[in-house]
Amino acid sequence: MRYAGTAHKVGDHIDTDAIIPARFLVTTDAQKLGENCMEGLEHGWVARVKSGDIMVGGRNFGCGSSREHAPIAILGAGMPVVVAHSFARIFYRNGFNMGLLLLEVGDDVDKIADGDDIEVDAASGVITNRTTGATITCAPVPQSMRELLDTGGLVPYVRARLERENG
């Protein structure tokens, strides 16, 4: 699993209300949620994002309310990966369950600036900043979690597994 794109860096303690404000929770449609991604942080933020770009967060990314809409909004905005110093635990599980790759890098997040061109190799846990040449190493994503991501999240994974087992 390799991803490459422009880094869109946000700060510490970005909560789920900033990622997708409550007024947009009337749908679960990824595209509609994606159109309003980070609207609680800055109006029109998502207009800078191109499909395949990568969100970069600070400490405690995804804190606040537990809502599946937040990772869906990030995916709907075209960003398949979030690299952060750290994640709120419930967001971390929700992210993988919705098919969003999340990588914790601690203080090495400071090696990535807004607008940098970065490449992520989830299997090896290596993130390369192609703008500066810096390399960040994090724990590789376990195979079981990569399987969740490969199938689009927990629900598609369970459906596929049940179909295999029950024919």
UniProtKB/Swiss-Prot annotation:
Pathway: Amino-acid biosynthesis; L-leucine biosynthesis; L-leucine from 3-methyl-2-oxobutanoate: step 2/4. It is an enzyme of class 4 (lyase). Its EC number is 4.2.1.33. Pfam families: Aconitase_C (PF00694). GO terms for biological process: L-leucine biosynthetic process. The keyword Isomerase does not apply. Keywords: Amino-acid biosynthesis, Branched-chain amino acid biosynthesis, Leucine biosynthesis, Lyase. It catalyses: (2R,3S)-3-isopropylmalate = (2S)-2-isopropylmalate. InterPro entries: Aconitase/3IPM_dehydase_swvl, AconitaseA/IPMdHydase_ssu_swvl, IPMI_Swivel, LeuD, LeuD_type2/HacB/DmdB. The keyword Amino-acid biosynthesis applies. One of its GO terms (molecular function) is 3-isopropylmalate dehydratase activity. Belongs to the LeuD family. LeuD type 2 subfamily. PANTHER family: 3-ISOPROPYLMALATE DEHYDRATASE SMALL SUBUNIT 1, 3-ISOPROPYLMALATE DEHYDRATASE SMALL SUBUNIT 2-RELATED-RELATED. Heterodimer of LeuC and LeuD. Catalyzes the isomerization between 2-isopropylmalate and 3-isopropylmalate, via the formation of 2-isopropylmaleate. This is 3-isopropylmalate dehydratase small subunit. It comes from Nitratidesulfovibrio vulgaris (strain ATCC 29579 / DSM 644 / CCUG 34227 / NCIMB 8303 / VKM B-1760 / Hildenborough) (Desulfovibrio vulgaris). The lineage of its organism: Bacteria, Pseudomonadati, Thermodesulfobacteriota, Desulfovibrionia, Desulfovibrionales.
